[in-house]
Structures are given as structure tokens and as C-alpha cells.
Curated annotation (Swiss-Prot):
Keywords: ATP-binding, Nucleotide-binding, Nucleotidyltransferase, Transferase. NCBIfam families: CysD (TIGR02039), PRK05253.1 (NF003587), PRK12563.1 (NF009214). The gene is cysD. Coiled coil: none annotated. It is an enzyme of class 2 (transferase). SUPFAM superfamilies: Adenine nucleotide alpha hydrolases-like. Residues 1-10 have a biased composition (Basic and acidic residues). Belongs to the PAPS reductase family. CysD subfamily. GO terms for molecular function: ATP binding; sulfate adenylyltransferase (ATP) activity. This is Sulfate adenylyltransferase subunit 2. Pfam families: PAPS_reduct. It comes from Agrobacterium fabrum (strain C58 / ATCC 33970) (Agrobacterium tumefaciens (strain C58)).
Length: 317
């Protein structure tokens, strides 16, 4: 499957499509409302763009929210240097196709010290190259609001986070200090130095995301679809073996099989699943009978030291 961006619309228009399912239309309306509320309430918003399926849906909704104008804020990609190569190629195609303003930020300390998932382990690597890098990028841009693609159905700590997630001047999150959100009324008042992470996809499920992708013909990184690919088995995960930087451990061997990814992150820390789902319809059918979370494929979520809530308290996405 090609990495090229394919859509039925031109780069500055949204093509006519059949009416959305009422459930998806309600979710779309809510997300567009959140985008417009944040853009109206805050001085300098930014959209976090991780290149995955949720980010792709988020970007599509942002384009709709401000159509026919350009998106009135930049995209921020926290670039660890360890994303799948297909993700970076896809990102560059999307930015060019849609005429987007993209900030790609890498933690200079991490780059100088050559911090890698292999040399520093998943928890320390994530803290330096993702959490610390995100805080630095938000400070450098003086952003007072950041859109993210997190959903409540993904993971326990995200389930209790509000749509407007308030952060301290050092970007920390206190789950005990959240504001009530009545219907679609959001309180965006912040003190000097504070900021908000806004999550327009909070009420979406993984299946909602995929059904919306199908309905709106949203392009994705091909890794989400099953294909014959090389991989190794490590720590109960299937790690893609297409990057020359992959360090094989004693006894490991490269295997081949039909695999795909439910979630995408840094390639050494993201596990694939065995799958024959090579089309959107196949993926949706597969998900409708799935019994485990998509984040089971993320090594960074597996131990207490790297738990999602701990990372979020420290400023993670």
C-alpha cells in the first residue's frame, strides 16, 4: 500500500459525501465545537500531531472546523527520532498536501546524549524524549492550549480526564483538581502560566474512529493495515524488523508474517498484532470482537514506573 496521501477532495476543499451516521455526526459536531471554543478562548493554541489514526481524525476535524480557511494554529510533532519510517514519510506528505504549519521538535539534551529506547530503557527514554520534549516545545512556543487526540476508552487515567485538562505552569496534571463540565460548557479561564490540554475525541471509541475514517475517506499510515512484514518477538510483543537500528538480542531471529498495528508510536516500543485485516472493513470487523485495549501494544504502559497516570502527572500527552 502506498504512503501517498489519497483523498477524494482537493487540498483546500472537503468533498461532498453521503450523510454521516447520526452517532458519528453527533461526535463530529462536539469535536468541531471544542475546536472552535478553544480557538476563541485562548491566545496561542497548538495541535499535537503524533501521525497516528487519532491524530489523522483530529486533523480532519480541525480542517472542517475552520473551513474554508486554513487551520489557525500550527501542528506540533514531538519527534523522538524513533518513529516508524513510514510515519515520517506520511507526515511530510500530509503537511505538503494540506499546506499545514508544522513544528517538529526534538529534545536537544536527548539528542546530544544519544538517548535511545535500547540504551536508556522505555521509561527514561519516554520521560526525556517525549514528556520533557513536549514541555520544552510548549514553553518555547508559549502555547496556552494544546489539542490532543486522547480518548477516554483507551486507558484508565484517560477515562477520568476532562475534555479541558488544566495544567500547572510546569505542565503537570492533578486529577483531583479538575473543573466540572456541564453539557457543552467549558471553563477556559486560566491563571498566568497555566495551560489547557483539550481533547475533542474524548467521547469517541476506537471503533468510532475507524468508522469515521471509513465514512470520511481519511488517509492513514499503511502500517494500520495487515501485510506480510518482518518482525521479531521480544517481551511478548512483535516488533517490526524493517529498521537497520533494531538491535537483535542473542537468540532472536527475524520472522515473517501478516501483521498490523492498532496503535503507532516509536518502533522499538510498539508491538504489532497478527492480522489478516488489510482493508478498512476488515479492521472494523476485527475490532468489533476484540477483547483487549489497543494500548496493550505499547511497552511504555506496561510497568508501574511507566504508567500512563504517572506520565500524565509529569506533563505527558
Amino acid at each position: 500500500m502506498s504512503n501517498a496521501v489519497h483523498e477524494t477532495d482537493s487540498k483546500n476543499t472537503v468533498a461532498s459525501k453521503p450523510p454521516l451516521d447520526p452517532h458519528l455526526k453527533a461526535l463530529e459536531n462536539e469535536a468541531i465545537h471544542i475546536f472552535r471554543e478553544v480557538a476563541a478562548e485562548f491566545d496561542n493554541p497548538v495541535m499535537l500531531y503524533s501521525i497516528g489514526k487519532d491524530s489523522s481524525v483530529l486533523l480532519h476535524l480541525a480542517r472542517k472546523a475552520f473551513f474554508p480557511g486554513r487551520i489557525p494554529f500550527p501542528l506540533l510533532h514531538v519527534n523522538t527520532g524513533w518513529k516508524f519510517k513510514e510515519m515520517i514519510e506520511f507526515r511530510d506528505n500530509i503537511v505538503k498536501e494540506y499546506d499545514l504549519d508544522l513544528i517538529s521538535y526534538t529534545n536537544p539534551r536527548g539528542a546530544l546524549e544519544n538517548v535511545t529506547p535500547f540504551s536508556h530503557g522505555s521509561a527514561l527514554y519516554t520521560d526525556i524524549m517525549k514528556t520533557e520534549a513536549l514541555r520544552q516545545a510548549l514553553d518555547a512556543g508559549q502555547f496556552d492550549a494544546a489539542f490532543g487526540g486522547a480518548r477516554r476508552d483507551e486507558e484508565a487515567s484517560r477515562a477520568k480526564e476532562r475534555i479541558y485538562s488544566f495544567r500547572t505552569p510546569d505542565h503537570k496534571w492533578d486529577p483531583r483538581n479538575q473543573r466540572p463540565e456541564l453539557w457543552n460548557i467549558y471553563n477556559g479561564m486560566v491563571r498566568k502560566g497555566e495551560s489547557v490540554r483539550a481533547f475533542p475525541l474524548s467521547n469517541w471509541t476506537e471503533v468510532d474512529i475507524w468508522r469515521y475514517i471509513e465514512a470520511e475517506n481519511i488517509p492513514l499510515v499503511p502500517l494500520y493495515y495487515a501485510a506480510e512484514r518482518p518482525y521479531i518477538e521480544r517481551d511478548g510483543m512483535m516488533i517490526l524488523a524493517e529498521d537497520e537500528r533494531l538491535e537483535l538480542l542473542p537468540g532472536e531471529e527475524i520472522k515473517h508474517g501478516s501483521i498490523r498495528f492498532r496503535t503507532l508510536g516509536c518502533f522499538p516500543l510498539t508491538g504489532a498484532i497478527r492480522s489478516e485485516a488489510a482493508t478498512l472493513q476488515d479492521v472494523i470487523a476485527e475490532l468489533e470482537i476484540a477483547t483487549v485495549s489497543e494500548r496493550q501494544g505499547r511497552a511504555i504502559d506496561r510497568d508501574q514506573s511507566g504508567s500512563m497516570e504517572k506520565k500524565k502527572r509529569e506533563g505527558y500527552f
